[in-house]
């Protein structure tokens, strides 16, 4: 069913023999089409994991190239509803937000269904592919729907190439040029007044930011508490010296515990300042 939805020749330029002969006798035997993976978008500014290689048998200790994918959307709304959506494909391995955004698409809710394609065209190891490195960020705006309902359904099908060795396969992939500064931006023609004001890379940065700040705040709080409990070694030693100077015998009857000379009780790890 997925192969009926996706036309491989839209992503890979086939030779005459590859169009006629069975794939087992050509280089097309390494090309795979995934089964459909679905996402039900219920929340605004939500990041969901997507399995772009669903149903694809990977090569052990090999590689997989995500040549391209087709994304189809269906609005679960009455006709002529206001609002719209921005959809962004993310590689969650990447830490720089402009490099993590592989491509985005914007459309209005009045367009009942839509479909678009992206061409990432890069390879990852089979081991990384099993960890599902791709996510989808969905930003629904201006749709007046009560919480808990699903205004939008998304389906994903990908075309990929699996291979054992990281050597050029000879397949001439259709590559879309991407500038160094910006990711691929696709926008439906019907979009006029619905304009995406915030770049997708900046939106992704804002979504990731609260989680990082919360973890940092908790870490600093724990370090602060641990510093307050420990007693400075120098103060304890000064107390002992003052008792001896007054002529009081410093034996076990004083109840003074012997402290280690390395002062480990008040030592602060450099990790506390990270």
Curated annotation (Swiss-Prot):
InterPro entries: TMV_movement, Viral_movement. It is found in: Host cytoplasm, Host cytoskeleton; Host cell junction, Host plasmodesma. Its main location: host cell. Keywords: Host cell junction, Host cytoplasm, Host cytoskeleton, RNA-binding, Transport, Viral movement protein. Residues 250-274 have a biased composition (Low complexity). One of its GO terms (cellular component) is host cytoskeleton. Residues 209-274 are annotated as: Disordered. GO terms for biological process: transport of virus in host, cell to cell. GO terms for molecular function: RNA binding. It holds the Pfam family MP. Transports viral genome to neighboring plant cells directly through plasmosdesmata, without any budding. The movement protein allows efficient cell to cell propagation, by bypassing the host cell wall barrier. Forms a ribonucleoprotein complex with viral RNA. Binds microtubules and modulates microtubule stability. Can bind double-stranded DNA. Belongs to the tobamovirus movement protein family. This is Movement protein. The lineage of its organism: Viruses, Riboviria, Orthornavirae, Kitrinoviricota, Alsuviricetes. The gene is MP.
